[in-house]
A protein has these predicted regions:
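Short, acidic/turn-prone active-site loops that include or flank metal/cofactor-
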Residues: 97-104, 260-262
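N-terminal glycine/serine-rich phosphate-binding loop of ATP-dependent small-molecule kinases
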Residues: 1-94, 122, 222-231, 359
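Short alpha-helix plus adjacent loop in nuclease-associated cores
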Residues: 101-113
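Glycine-rich phosphate-binding loops at beta-strand->alpha-helix junctions
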Residues: 209-217, 262
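Short beta-strand-loop/turn "lid" adjacent to the catalytic site in phosphate-handling enzymes
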Residues: 66-99, 127-133, 162-183, 206-209
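Phosphate/pyrophosphate-binding loops at sites that engage ATP/ADP/AMP, CoA/4′-phosphopantetheine
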Residues: 60-72, 144-148, 194-198
Length: 361
């Protein structure tokens, strides 16, 4: 009987459960469950629906039971930087705000009161992006200081789902590095930096590496899904898992991972935290086996995903692409990487405004 292994891959627009097993020396992958994802407005903030998403994770496990393919182990990967803060009773503090929310506006300047951008990059090797965990935490500190006072635990999104599955609190390395608070030298939290910024040390769990066993399903989840398995931390940052899957047999390769974001880069054995790299805004995200994903963040499918949502998902992605191909006379060129497209009210309106002002043509 085949041994099955379950990957739960949750992106910014959808999630999927994929079962894998070996057959005649080859890995066979089977998607068994899929669900929608996206941010919703709550109290004026763009938030993730983590309660609903976790129900979908559990529903996918129930699907395994239904089809008679019980996995030996599983792990969850997601996008980077976002997190929850838990109080002493493990309750989420505040809204589950997502990285496209505007709460981080101006927070870079607050961080730079404690450390310059140049010195911050030299310490972490992570790109300047206003949505990084370091700036999100500064927004919490400035706008809801009571949350930091009450917080006992910080968990990034995949770590939070692993906690809900097992009851065990962990922080996986590749995901943690995206937040700009981890040292590429020690491969641990930069506690000196954390102290400089006034973030409570006690929130930050010990980092674990990909491949670390976290634990078995809790009694509650085991009873609900009808079986038990081991939860093992993958490279929980989705790009980390994608790069690990690149079919390259040597170190000399370039990868492009495309989803809501597109990431283009290489693998390195050491981080490049030079001033030149800082000026180019390249990032050194943690990878498997202590390597670094030296890459550039590029706008991916977010714009077409947003256009689809603006028309209430009336068309499939294939239909939207077909309509775009039919509109051959399209005179403008748009800089899709411009920050105005990070979280506009509507992508189509932003493009029209840009076209009128010639700002991005």
């Amino acid at each position: 009987m085949a041994a099955y292994y379950l990957a739960v891959d949750i992106g910014a627009s959808s999630g999927r459960h994929i079962l894998g097993h070996m057959e005649n020396g080859k890995m066979v992958l089977e998607e068994i469950y899929r669900f929608e994802n996206g941010m919703v407005k709550k109290d004026g903030e763009l938030c993730w629906e983590f309660d609903r998403l976790f129900k979908e994770v559990v529903n996918g496990l129930k699907k395994c039971k239904e089809i008679g393919k019980i996995p030996v182990s599983m792990g969850v990967d997601t996008w980077g930087v976002d997190f929850v803060l838990l109080d002493k009773d493990d309750k989420v503090l505040g809204n589950t705000v997502g990285y496209r929310d505007h709460r981080t506006e101006g927070m870079d300047k607050e961080v730079y009161k404690a450390i310059s951008l140049k010195d911050l990059y030299a310490r972490t090797g992570i790109q300047k992006a206003d949505y990084n965990t370091i700036y999100q935490l500064m927004a919490v500190k400035k706008k809801h200081p009571e949350y930091l006072e009450q917080a006992e635990t910080l968990l990034h999104v995949p770590d939070y789902f692993h906690f809900l599955l097992t009851g065990q609190k962990t922080c996986e390395y590749t995901e943690a590095t995206t937040g700009q608070l981890v040292s590429p030298i020690t491969k641990d939290w930069d506690y000196e930096l954390i102290d400089m910024l006034g973030y409570p040390r006690k929130m930050f769990q010990k980092l674990i590496m990909p491949g670390t066993g976290i634990g078995h399903l809790s009694d509650k989840i085991r009873e609900e899904v009808g079986f038990d398995l081991e939860v093992v931390a993958p490279a929980t940052h989705d790009t980390g898992s994608a790069v690990l899957a690149v079919p390259a047999n040597d170190d000399d390769f370039i990868y492009i991972s495309s989803g809501t974001w597109s990431l283009m880069g290489i693998e390195r054995k050491e981080a490049d935290c030079s001033e030149k790299s800082c000026e180019m805004n390249f990032t050194n995200e943690g990878g498997y086996a202590g390597r670094f994903r030296y890459l550039k963040n590029i706008m991916g499918l977010w714009m077409i995903q947003s256009v689809r949502h603006e028309v209430n998902d009336a068309y499939s992605f294939a239909e939207i692409c077909a309509m775009a191909e039919e509109a051959k006379d399209f005179p403008s060129r748009v800089d899709a990487n411009d920050e105005c497209f990070l979280s506009p009210d509507t992508v189509s309106y932003t493009h029209l405004r840009a076209h009128e002002t010639d700002s991005y043509l």
